């Protein structure tokens, strides 16, 4: 049995976008934001980007149903434009969320900032296999990243302690489609000759 919201549907509970996205990323609990009192003072910088939950709901429903969407998307280069997307995954780059989707306008997979989708409508009809996640080679390909303290850092042991390095290196795996986000999020110098300022780039991509 499958339940789909009608046009008149209104949620009983109100949830913050941060909470909903955390559930999608880490798994669902009991479905309630209990707002438990903190055991110790603990604060973070917060998130300035808050996607529209109705858009997120439409996107995730299309992902589960393997259907296409007609969206209005705001691009920095071309402004508002209509696109046909087949959403296949969500990706968090540390600052904002992206929708990984097959772009029918350009016949390729790409990332679309979730908060820049201002309108989304599910399209009738089936999608092709080449539009689904299994056909996304960049998503399927796993790359190895070997991170070391930037050679320009005066005290590399401090960086090793920050990241819990073993033998002076941190080895991680990433989807090829997301590797750029990893490099940007952690300000990793990926230049061959580690030429970026070590005061802002504590890590260097050795491989």
Regions found by a protein language model. Give the residues of each.
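Bulky hydrophobic/aromatic content
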Residues: 5-74, 180-185, 189-206
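Conserved glycine-centered beta->alpha loop in an early N-terminal alpha/beta scaffold
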Residues: 1
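Polybasic (Lys/Arg-rich)
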Residues: 138-207
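Core beta-strand-centered patch of the WYL/Sm-like small regulatory domain
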Residues: 37-163
């Amino acid at each position: 049995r499958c339940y789909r919201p009608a046009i008149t549907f209104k949620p009983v509970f109100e949830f913050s976008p941060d909470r909903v996205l955390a559930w999608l990323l880490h798994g669902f609990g009991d479905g309630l934001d209990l707002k438990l009192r903190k055991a110790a003072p603990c604060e973070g910088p917060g998130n300035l980007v808050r996607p529209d939950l109705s858009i997120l709901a439409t996107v995730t429903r299309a992902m589960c149903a393997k259907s296409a969407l007609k969206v209005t998307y705001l691009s920095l280069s071309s402004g508002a434009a209509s696109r046909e997307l087949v959403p296949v995954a969500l990706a968090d780059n540390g600052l904002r969320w992206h929708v990984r989707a097959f772009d029918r306008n350009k016949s390729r997979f790409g990332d679309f900032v979730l908060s820049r989708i201002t309108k989304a409508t599910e399209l009738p009809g089936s999608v092709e296999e080449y539009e689904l996640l299994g056909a996304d080679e960049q998503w399927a390909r796993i790359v190895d990243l070997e991170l070391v303290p930037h050679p320009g850092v005066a005290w590399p042991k401090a960086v090793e302690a920050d990241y819990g390095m073993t033998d002076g290196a941190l080895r991680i795996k990433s989807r090829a489609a997301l590797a750029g986000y990893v490099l940007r999020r952690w300000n990793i110098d990926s230049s061959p000759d580690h030429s970026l300022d070590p005061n802002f780039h504590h890590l260097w991509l050795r491989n």
